[in-house]
């Protein structure tokens, strides 16, 4: 997809952009590179649920973000880093004010930070009219995080390598009950743990899709975090359930919204969650399409 259009940069107009969650429907770790990065085979699917970024482009050079993340400087914020990376790649010196309505938990395995970075790249490329295509934006995003490219490209995908080799996929669009145990898990803590499985055999996509979906991180996460173990055990009483990413979120899959809502109502006091639908086209792409048609 090409983002080129005939628009001039769009200043001082509030625009709203979705920043959806993702699930890893399966996640296998097949090796580790000399630089420490892990080789993966994973299946990404988006959810129709996530944060919202309200972005106003400006003709000043300032990039401002509200609210700030406690303990994180503006320059270390992934949203700021994405905006600055786009400026570095294109030479533009335009600015933006970005408001974030944050509902995705940090340390949950839903890709919230990566999704925020991707939405920033896609939105500002449109608002600033920097004319990069999605492949180039994905390349910029990869330097910000391994999960950023899938959010930029906007389609559910089978991913290999460190997550950057993406093959479009169309898993069934099921309903999910996503729960968040009361713990935040840093990805680096799981991927550096000596007991993490790192030698799962590589398989063809056909074989993976036909098999039982699992997550190689789940065993060690459940051992290290009893809250996650308790959540998985509770959900398994009702439906197939597993960890997404490195956690801490755990999801159960259902064939209908009614089934998922019924179990949501049964959640114990110690577990919080939400119901969302798996979607194979990111809500971000629909929003970009609507904006882009204004500039044909």
Swiss-Prot record:
**Active site positions, chain numbering:** 22, 147
Keywords from the UniProt entry: ATP-binding, Isoprene biosynthesis, Kinase, Nucleotide-binding, Transferase
Q: Which domain of life is it from?
A: Bacteria
- Say which enzyme class the record assigns: transferase
Q: Which family does it belong to?
A: Belongs to the GHMP kinase family. IspE subfamily.
Q: What does this protein do?
A: Catalyzes the phosphorylation of the position 2 hydroxy group of 4-diphosphocytidyl-2C-methyl-D-erythritol.
Q: State the name under which the record lists this protein.
A: 4-diphosphocytidyl-2-C-methyl-D-erythritol kinase
List the gene name: ispE
């Amino acid at each position: 997809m090409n983002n080129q259009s005939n628009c001039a940069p769009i200043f001082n107009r509030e625009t709203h952009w979705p920043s959806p969650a993702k699930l890893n429907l399966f996640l296998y770790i097949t090796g580790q590179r000399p630089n420490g990065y892990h080789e993966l085979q994973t299946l990404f699917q988006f959810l129709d649920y996530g944060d919202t970024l309200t972005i106003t482009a400006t003709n000043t050079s300032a990039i401002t973000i509200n609210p700030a993340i406690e303990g994180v400087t503006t320059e270390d914020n992934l949203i700021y880093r994405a905006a600055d990376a786009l400026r570095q790649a294109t030479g533009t010196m335009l600015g933006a004010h970005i408001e974030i309505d944050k509902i995705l938990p940090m340390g949950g395995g839903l890709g919230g930070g990566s999704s925020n970075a991707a939405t920033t790249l896609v939105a500002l490329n449109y608002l600033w009219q920097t004319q990069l295509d999605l492949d180039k934006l994905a390349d910029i995003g990869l330097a910000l995080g391994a999960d950023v490219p899938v959010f930029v490209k906007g389609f559910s995908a089978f991913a290999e390598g460190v997550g950057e080799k993406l093959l479009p996929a169309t898993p069934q669009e099921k309903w999910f009950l996503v729960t968040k145990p009361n713990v935040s898990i840093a990805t680096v803590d799981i991927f550096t743990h000596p007991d993490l499985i790192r030698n799962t055999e590589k398989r063809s996509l056909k074989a993976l899709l036909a098999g039982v979906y699992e997550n190689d991180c789940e065993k060690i996460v459940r051992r290290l975090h009893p809250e996650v173990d308790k959540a998985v055990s509770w959900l398994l009483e009702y439906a197939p359930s597993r960890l997404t990413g490195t956690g801490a979120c755990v999801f159960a899959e259902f064939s209908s919204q009614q089934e998922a809502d019924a179990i949501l109502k049964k959640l114990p006091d110690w577990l919080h969650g939400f119901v969302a639908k798996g979607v194979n086209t990111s809500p971000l792409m629909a929003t970009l399409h609507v904006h882009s048609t204004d500039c044909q």
